[in-house]
From Swiss-Prot:
Induction conditions: Expressed only in the forespore compartment of sporulating cells.
Protein name listed in UniProt: Small, acid-soluble spore protein K
GO biological process: asexual sporulation; sporulation resulting in formation of a cellular spore
Superkingdom of this protein's organism: Bacteria
Keyword Heme (UniProt): no
Gene Ontology CC: endospore-forming forespore
Record's subcellular location: Spore core
InterPro entries according to UniProt: SASP_SspK (IPR012611)
Annotated organism of origin: Bacillus cytotoxicus (strain DSM 22905 / CIP 110041 / 391-98 / NVH 391-98)
Keywords: Sporulation
Gene name for this UniProt entry: sspK
Family, similarity comment: Belongs to the SspK family.
């Protein structure tokens, strides 16, 4: 194995998952009124309902 491959392999195997998550609430997608889509299954069910005339 070459020197470059050894370095890459070491850095990949030594990666840590400890610490704070990188995703932050301030970057979450929100609607213009400030709400977020917390119940997508309900929305999908409502979209598939047949409208009765």
């Amino acid at each position: 194995m070459g020197r470059q491959a050894e370095f890459w392999s070491e850095s990949k195997n030594n990666s840590k998952i400890d610490g704070q998550p990188k995703a932050k609430a301030r970057f979450a997608s929100k609607r213009p009124n400030g709400t977020i889509n917390t119940h997508p299954q309900e929305r999908m069910r409502a979209a598939n309902q047949q409208e009765e005339e």
